[in-house]
Amino acid sequence: MNRASKAQELFNQGYACSQAVILAFSDLIDIDSEKLSKLVLPLGGGLGRLRLTCGAINSMSMVIGILFSNSESNEENKNNTYAIVQELVNRFIEENKTINCAELLKQAELEVQIGGKAEERTSEYYKKRPCGKIVYSVAKILEEFLKEKEVI
């Protein structure tokens, strides 16, 4: 199974968008999966259901940071990492038009609720939500990039 399908499967099992993406790449990260899952959960729903930057995009950025940056505080490190994130975000925008959670939901003609509690994951939820496809798209872009860079 490719990582994009794995991410979509994880989302369909009830994980947040942010968790699904990072867990699909967890074997590449020197942090155990349980900690990764906890670390990125607040990013789901566009940062705690505030419908800002898509949680899947945020987790993709974290994978890039872990794999391509270092702990040094210098401009070269920052600029190299930022350039990769910008490239991958632009690839996502080409396919999906935006990285904003609210806008992605509106494209699916859904009413956008900001804040509040997570919705119950029912079959109806999965039918109407674009999130599984979005998680797949983010993970596919990241997977392709990592293959280009011969990381996987």
Which ranges hold each PLM region?
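DPxDG-like acidic metal-binding loop motif
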Residues: 58-67
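Transmembrane alpha-helix interface/packing and boundary motifs in multi-pass membrane proteins
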Residues: 43-50
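C-terminal binding/interaction regions
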Residues: 85-152
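Polybasic, low-complexity association/targeting segments
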Residues: 1-13
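Short cysteine clusters
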Residues: 17, 54, 101
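Acidic-glycine-rich active-site phosphate/pyrophosphate-binding loop
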Residues: 24-42, 111-116
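Phosphate-handling active-site elements
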Residues: 29-38, 66-87
